[in-house]
Each structure stands twice: as structure tokens, then as C-alpha cells.
């Protein structure tokens, strides 16, 4: 197993993508701290991890707040005594609320946009801040954040979300430069359109259209994101840092060229 004796924090660890990451890291021997706002889902994930033969701790926190991120780290250290891996999965968008291409620039309300920015950019930054001193003291660690192809090629009617995910890439590169001397590697994964239960439920009629724009002709599976994360937190990627791994089936390649 690739992660024996490692301790991993997975924020959003009870969500669709986070669940697959949590289970895969557990199968590879990691002890898991599942940090999520959903207490009931957290408890279910603890049971799933135990069924896989590993240990787990559920921490109900909202990492948008720095004190909650610090609480998460303190709980992990109290239980396991070390943190080797941080995977920032918590994030997402409530879906586009603008009806035309220019509505974003005309509207005055700020609440929703600020919420998306805080959830998708400030929260991962808070978690990295909360854990970095411990990793520096141990002179080792791996941080992986989930970004999005929206941060690479943009997303129509998703200005705030795209900006936040692009910010994750910038955060990753900068933190990788600053933390390298302490043996800490920092990378991110940018999924394309992931076929979660929520996507199939909310937009079933759009899936054929999306698949036409993806070179491999299908949506991404959550397990494929988990596999990329496992690679980046394991010793198999020991010489990789500051990178954005795009897992999109060719979505970012765009339309056919000449």
C-alpha cells in the first residue's frame, strides 16, 4: 500500500468527489480526517473507511472560517499526532444565476459571488495556512487542491467560480515555491465535467451536448479524480510540485483545428 502510516485530511470528504478520494486513500493505508459540514454524511464516511480497514476521524467544520480550519488541524493532531497530506476538495457552485452574458456586469448584489469566492478560494487557503507550520516542522508533506477547468478556459455564466478556481492554480504555484525548501510538495487537480449524481439529476438534457465537446466522448468519473490525487500525494510523484494536473478527457483541447 502506498500510504501506510500516513495521515490525510480531506476537506469536503463526504461529498461526491471527496468520498471517492477518501476511500481510495484509505484503501492505500492512510488514516483519514474527514472534514465536512454535513455531520450525518461524515459519520457514514467514517464507517466506510473503517470497513476498508483503516482509521478515520470526522470533524464537522466550515473551513471558510480560519478558526474552523485551525480546529480541524488541532483535532487531527490530537487524534493521530501528525498530518502528512491535505486534500482541499470542499468547494462548488450553486449554479449560474445570470440569464445573459452581460447580467454579471449589470447586477449590484454581491452576496452570492462573495460566497462562491470564499468557498472555492479562501477555504483552501485557510486550510493550507492551518496545516503548513506543522508540515514545515516535520519537513515533509503533500498538499493537493481541487481546481477546475473553469479556471483554465473559463465557464460561461460562472465568473466568480472561474476566478476562484484560477486563483487555486496561482495559490498552488506560489505555495509550491515557498514550501519546497521544507520538503513540502503542492499541486492541484483540475477536473473537467464530472459525472456526479448531482450533475445527472440537475442537467440530464445537457449531458449529450457536453460529451460532444469532450475529446474522449464522456464525462469524468469521480474515481478518476481520486486516482490523480492519489498519485500526487504518494511517493510516485516525489519530484512533482507546483503543477496543475488537468483531468478533463480533452475538454480543454477545444474544437478541431486545421
Give the ranges of each region predicted by the language model.
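Canonical Rossmann dinucleotide-binding motif of NAD(H)/NADP(H)-dependent dehydrogenases/reductases
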Residues: 3-33, 175
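Substrate-binding pocket helix/loop in short-chain dehydrogenase/reductase
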Residues: 96-114, 199, 210
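Active-site helix of classical SDR
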Residues: 128, 164, 172
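Alpha-helical segment proximal to the catalytic Tyr-Lys
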Residues: 133, 177-181, 238
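Residue(s) in the substrate-gating loop at a strand-loop-helix junction
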Residues: 148
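Short C-terminal tail/terminal secondary-structure segment
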Residues: 153, 230, 241-258
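A conserved structural motif in NAD(P)-dependent oxidoreductases
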Residues: 214-225, 236
Amino acid at each position: 500500500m502506498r500510504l501506510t502510516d500516513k495521515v490525510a485530511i480531506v476537506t469536503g470528504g463526504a461529498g461526491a468527489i471527496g468520498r471517492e478520494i477518501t476511500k481510495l486513500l484509505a484503501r492505500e493505508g492512510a488514516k483519514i480526517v474527514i472534514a465536512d459540514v454535513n455531520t450525518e454524511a461524515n459519520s457514514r464516511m467514517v464507517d466506510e473507511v473503517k470497513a476498508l480497514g483503516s482509521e478515520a476521524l470526522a470533524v464537522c467544520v466550515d473551513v471558510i472560517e480560519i478558526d474552523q480550519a485551525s480546529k480541524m488541524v488541532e483535532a487531527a493532531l490530537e487524534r493521530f499526532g501528525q498530518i502528512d497530506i491535505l486534500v482541499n476538495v470542499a468547494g462548488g457552485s450553486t449554479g449560474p444565476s445570470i440569464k445573459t452574458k452581460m447580467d454579471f456586469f449589470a447586477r449590484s448584489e454581491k452576496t452570492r459571488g462573495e460566497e462562491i469566492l470564499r468557498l472555492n478560494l479562501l477555504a483552501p487557503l485557510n486550510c493550507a495556512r492551518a496545516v503548513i507550520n506543522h508540515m514545515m516542522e516535520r519537513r515533509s508533506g503533500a498538499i493537493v487542491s481541487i481546481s477546475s477547468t473553469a479556471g483554465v478556459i473559463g465557464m460561461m455564466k460562472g465568473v466568480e467560480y472561474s476566478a476562484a478556481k484560477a486563483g487555486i492554480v496561482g495559490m498552488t504555484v506560489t505555495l509550491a515555491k515557498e514550501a519546497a525548501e521544507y520538503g513540502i510538495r503542492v499541486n492541484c487537480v483540475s477536473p473537467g465535467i464530472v459525472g456526479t449524481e448531482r450533475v445527472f439529476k440537475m442537467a440530464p438534457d445537457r449531458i449529450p451536448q457536453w460529451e460532444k465537446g469532450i475529446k474522449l466522448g464522456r464525462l469524468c468519473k469521480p474515481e478518476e479524480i481520486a486516482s490523480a490525487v492519489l498519485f500526487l500525494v504518494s511517493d510516485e510523484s516525489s519530484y512533482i510540485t507546483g503543477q496543475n494536473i488537468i483531468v478533463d478527457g480533452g475538454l480543454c483541447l477545444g474544437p478541431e483545428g486545421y
